[in-house]
Amino acid sequence: MLDRTIPFYNIILRCDRYLTTTPVLHNGYEFRMYQDGDERKWAQLEYEIGDFDSVDEAEQYFISTYCSKKALDITERCVFVVNEKNEIVGSCIAWKELRNDILVASLHWLVVSPQYQGKGIGKALCQKVMQIFVVNDEFPVYIHTQPWSYKAIILYVRQGFKIQKTDSFSQYENQFNFAMNTLKKILPENQYEELTYNIEL
């Protein structure tokens, strides 16, 4: 589970170019795209890791954010990983948000059920969603995250994302200094140094 006692600060990452990598899932897992009715399953997954106070709240968020945008088809942009029982165990969304009144690509809600973490599912989901951006030629790709998602941040920089000192998108205030100071306190020295090698002005 995420340690939400870690202070919250906005971290912005951006990927300008991506070398396509074939995602690999262990036997028993496979990708599938969003289908009607999956919003409840997505909501249960997000509630399970504590991102929302209730399943209903998460479901309403998904519907209002992703199912009402005519310009973007959620069935082509929301990727799930399912297990042998066809249960959703992970998800990630290839979306878009405004930056200076122009839509830019944004990777949303990379999440893996706690009991399925450590199996490479998050990495595979990230790679699968990045393929969507590649096919649609939608670069740069932005991510908004926070220090308590430090494991995901390390994954992102290993996939080619750079932590932004000043750049941002949507309504997010870039809180680079506060965020990096927080990460320095919680990460092993070698992991923090890896992040510092992936900072962009």
What are these model-derived regions, one by one?
Residues 143-153, 169-180:
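Conserved beta-strand-loop-alpha-helix junction that forms the acyl-donor binding cleft
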Residues 133-145:
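Conserved GNAT acetyl-CoA-binding A-motif
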Residues 157-166:
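Conserved acetyl-CoA-binding loop of GNAT-fold acetyltransferases
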Residues 47-112:
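A conserved beta-strand-loop-helix scaffold within acyl/acetyltransferase catalytic domains
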Residues 30-42:
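A short beta-loop-alpha structural element at the N-terminal edge
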Residues 1-27:
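Acyl-donor-binding surface of acyltransferase catalytic domains
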Residues 109-112, 118-135, 154-158:
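Conserved acetyl-CoA-binding loop-helix of GNAT-fold acetyltransferases
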Residues 34, 110-112, 145:
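Hydrophobic adenine-recognition pocket in adenosine-nucleotide-binding enzymes
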